[in-house]
Amino acid sequence: MIKNTKKSQKNKILTLEDVSISYGTFEAVRNVFCNFKSGDITSLIGPSGCGKSTVLRALNRMNDLIPNCSLRGTVLFDGTNIYDKRVDPVEVRRRIGMVFQQPNPFPKSIYENIAFGARINGFVGDMDELVESSLRKAAVWSECKDKLNDSGYSLSGGQQQRLCIARTIAIEPEIILMDEPCSALDPISTLKIEETMHELKKNYTIIIVTHNMQQALRVSDMTAFFNAVEYEEGDGGKVGYLAEFDSTKKIFSSPKEKTTQEYISGKFG
């Protein structure tokens, strides 16, 4: 079981040690070493097929749900290998929450979208207070407070995504993973999500996959650039790898790798 050190979150770190991920015989990502610091927003960027979403899903064992997906190496959270057989993956996903690319509210009321997960995770406090505080943290309370009994589907796309963020917050995670959370949203909704992320950073560590370079520059403290190279066997397949990891300021102003510069300047993608 992962030890609970919520009160000392600033000391937390999520570490990947020589992580390689495969789908059957296809190796998607190879030899990733990376540290995610507590309290940071970290962006994972890179061209399609470089494995950044695969790596993101590995951080809370969502890849376990994909047939024939396997991981070599170690993923440490609070010093515990989350892939140890003694670790409950459901507990991992509670402590490290996920917001997906497409808004996916439950087919329930707005209120129950928040309350349902908290209830099955054993919450015994004031549910009304939890619902309100979660919706406030996700910056959607003012738009929902008068229609909590309406379906989550009645909200706009941007509101639905913030509802999903609130739903994640309600089960009290310590890290929030976001897989291109704004890709299906309009610019105004995207701005609201980004503003929400800046507020959430005060209490949560956030790791986000994005194809939007300006978004990475606006929201993140650290940026990891993933790229892909052809297999040594020369069969035309490619494997992803972590090409560069540094502060967002350095990645976008003075990257060490030529490929990083070429990617952020739009020469490939």
Swiss-Prot record:
Family to which this protein belongs: Belongs to the ABC transporter superfamily. Phosphate importer (TC 3.A.1.7) family.
Gene Ontology molecular function: ATP binding; ATP hydrolysis activity; ATPase-coupled phosphate ion transmembrane transporter activity
Species whose genome carries this gene: Prochlorococcus marinus subsp. pastoris (strain CCMP1986 / NIES-2087 / MED4)
Primary residence: membrane
Subunit architecture: The complex is composed of two ATP-binding proteins (PstB), two transmembrane proteins (PstC and PstA) and a solute-binding protein (PstS).
Entry keyword set: ATP-binding, Cell inner membrane, Cell membrane, Membrane, Nucleotide-binding, Phosphate transport, Translocase, Transport
GO cellular component: plasma membrane
Name recorded for this polypeptide: Phosphate import ATP-binding protein PstB
SUPFAM superfamilies: P-loop containing nucleoside triphosphate hydrolases
Enzyme Commission (EC) number: 7.3.2.1
CDD domains documented for this protein: ABC_PstB_phosphate_transporter
Highest rank taxon of the organism: Bacteria
